[in-house]
């Protein structure tokens, strides 16, 4: 999928292997960036860490002054490869644990889990994460895409464009909405509280995050796929608490407001 987005076409076997090799060879961060991440406030939001890390990558990149299409393709791949490493490193530091360096023998999704937790989880969980990354990878002309294109329209550099896009993506009316949904789930705590909570929220005219879309009036097209994997992970973990909360809230929102997730 990453190859498709960058090259506008699917790779053959040889092209895919070359692309995967390049991605794996560029996962490691500089000593300088690791040190910067170590000194970031532990309360920092991960999206702010990603934004800052990409900006530093731009300062360090050997082709930072070259904005040719060919150089931008190479820089895009390096940003793609290094960003998970930066986020995982910050996660470990925030937890008071030693940084785990990337492994070249793991897939993109597997490697992120490994760098965060020191092990790769069950294949079903890796698959669910992979599917989520694919669904988020490209989503038409949204706010963060618009932001990146606005920045590049002045012929600014790719790292600056991605830094701006990440800042835009963080917002609760864009990519940050899923974080707000998780906060909502944690407030509800258990399925027995869900019906009362959602009814009170509607009665008090509160915003219920995760519902309603400026484009998808009958529901986000990504939801059915993620709902499927949500259920698979819940079953695997033998914990359907959040799945049950979701189903109750969704049912009430559709019935009372005709608003879909």
Language-model features: locations:
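Hydrophobic alpha-helical bundle cores within soluble ligand-binding/oligomerization subdomains
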Residues: 1-261
């Amino acid at each position: 999928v990453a190859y498709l987005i960058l090259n506008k076409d699917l790779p053959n076997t040889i092209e895919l292997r070359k692309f995967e090799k390049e991605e794996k060879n560029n996962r490691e961060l500089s000593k300088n960036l690791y040190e910067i991440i170590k000194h970031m406030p532990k309360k920092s939001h991960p999206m702010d860490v990603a934004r800052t890390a990409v900006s530093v990558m731009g300062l360090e990149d050997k082709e930072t002054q070259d904005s040719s299409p060919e150089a931008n393709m190479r820089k895009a791949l390096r940003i793609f490869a290094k960003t998970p490493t930066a986020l995982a490193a910050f996660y470990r530091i925030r937890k008071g644990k030693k940084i785990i360096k990337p492994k070249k023998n793991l897939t993109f999704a597997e490697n992120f889990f490994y760098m965060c937790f020191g092990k790769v989880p069950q294949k079903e969980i890796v698959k669910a994460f992979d599917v989520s990354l694919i669904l988020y990878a490209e989503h038409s002309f949204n706010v963060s895409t618009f932001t990146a294109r606005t920045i590049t329209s002045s012929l600014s550099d790719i790292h600056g464009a991605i830094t701006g896009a990440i800042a835009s993506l963080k917002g609760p009316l864009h990519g940050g909405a899923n974080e707000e949904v998780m906060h909502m789930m944690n407030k509800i705590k258990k399925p027995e509280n869900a019906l009362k909570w959602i009814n009170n929220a509607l009665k008090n005219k509160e915003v219920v995050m995760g519902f309603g879309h400026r484009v998808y009036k009958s529901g986000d097209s990504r939801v059915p796929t993620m709902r499927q994997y949500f259920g698979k992970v819940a079953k695997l973990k033998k914990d359907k608490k959040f799945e049950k909360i979701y189903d109750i809230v969704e049912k009430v929102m559709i019935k009372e407001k005709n608003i879909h997730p």
